[in-house]
Design a protein with these regions (language model features):
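A short, N-terminal "cap"/entry segment at the start of jelly-roll beta-barrel domains
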Residues: 1-51
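Conserved short histidine dyad/triad with adjacent acidic residue
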Residues: 40-43, 53-70
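Short, charged/polar surface micro-motifs in flexible loops or helix N-caps
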Residues: 47-50, 59-63, 83, 126-129
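A short hydrophobic beta-strand segment most commonly corresponding to one strand
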Residues: 56, 76, 102, 116-129
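A generic "binding-loop/recognition-motif" signal
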Residues: 61, 72-73, 91, 107-108, ...
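Glycine- and acidic-residue-biased ligand/ion/polar-headgroup-sensing regions
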Residues: 72-75, 79-84
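Short acidic-glycine-tyrosine-enriched beta hairpin
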Residues: 90-105
Length: 129
């Protein structure tokens, strides 16, 4: 798998007025429900007064974020490395580098990583955390 884009972001930084954070300083957090899924909470609701949150997501090969909904958040995915499949409101979407997917609030969705894992940015409006 070509992880160049992922590596660029994992070694990247967040720069906003008054704040500069290297992504390497942000710890990976295990997903509280889904095994093999880890997140870096790049921007949280605390940073945006609850308006949005931004997360780097790493899904291990063959693992999944199983079917779920977000009652109040619109969610976007931007695939930056690896491959997989997203089922978005019953429609299968092939996930590969460059794909962007949008899940409106209350829409069931799930994401399964391929054999090489899956790396994406997930944004939530309003903030998930």
């Amino acid at each position: 798998m070509n992880k160049e884009v992922f590596e660029a972001f994992i070694n990247g930084s967040l720069a906003v007025p008054g704040k500069f954070i290297k992504f390497e300083q942000i710890e990976w957090s295990k997903h509280p429900i889904f095994d093999g899924v880890e997140l870096k909470h790049i921007i949280t609701g605390k940073d945006t007064e609850g308006q949005f949150s931004y997360h780097l997501v790493r899904i291990a090969p063959g693992k999944a974020i199983k079917n779920h909904i977000h009652e109040t958040q619109l969610e976007t995915h931007e695939v930056i490395a690896g491959t997989g499949v997203c089922i978005n409101d019953g429609v299968e979407i092939k996930y590969e580098v460059g794909v962007i997917s949008i899940m409106p609030a209350k829409v069931p969705h799930e994401v399964m990583a391929g054999n090489d894992g899956l790396y994406l940015f997930a944004k939530f409006i309003p903030a998930l955390c």
